[in-house]
Amino acid sequence: MSDSVVAVSASPVTPQTASAEKKVAAKKPASASASKAKKTTAPPTHPPTQQMVDASIQNLKERGGSSLLAIKKYISATYKCDAQKLAPFIKKYLKNSVANGKLIQTKGKGASGSFKLSASSKKEPKPKVSSVEKKSKKVTSSAAAAKKKTISATKKPKGVADKKLSKAVVTKKSVDKKKAEKAKAKDAKKVGTIKAKPTTAKAKSSAAKPKTPKPKTTSAKPKKVVAAASPKKAAAKKPKAKTASATKK
């Protein structure tokens, strides 16, 4: 009897455990699909409505102010988004900005009029950096600092090599200077020897100059002899004239 009672009590336990396991298994994929759906939600392709409305009013540059329709058209054309879905957010921002003094309502009441930027809002505020961007900047700055440290550590042996190269360059320069000085000394010696030669040539020419006047004295003497000989011929001709006069008598 006891065995049969145990068997009857054990039989209803098995279906309950099976159903519980099925429920747990069914809950797991549902939670996984929900987490995947959260991850796959794409970020917005346009900036917030505040920036879009301010940019539209600033770029339209209407004297009487920009109307709600003009703002919607500008947002849909430039940012390529559905302005009708964003209409309640645009109206809310227009009302709040008029109350805060950021916008000036030139016509109408509420969100149905025309709006202009105030003098304080015309100054373009700096865009707020999100916390994610700040963290990314910190990470990049720390990575850049680590890279600088590694670069500085690797550059130290290069400094030793640079010192060796500088020493080699200095030695080469000193050798080149010595060679240049030797070449200059050789050139100076050559110039000294070349300059000494003309002095000897001048001395020779000055010594040879006194010898030239001697032939002049010899050439002048025969002229005097010719001049002395000419009167003798004239004297010889005179006796012939006397004989002619004697014959005439």
Swiss-Prot record:
Gene Ontology BP annotations: chromosome condensation; negative regulation of DNA recombination; nucleosome assembly
KW Nucleus (keyword) present: yes
Pfam families in the cross-refs: Linker_histone
Gene Ontology MF term list: double-stranded DNA binding; nucleosomal DNA binding; structural constituent of chromatin
Region Disordered, annotated ranges: 1-53, 105-249
Function: Histones H1 are necessary for the condensation of nucleosome chains into higher-order structures.
PANTHER family: H15 DOMAIN-CONTAINING PROTEIN-RELATED, HISTONE H1
UniProt name for this protein: Histone H1
Gene (UniProt): His1
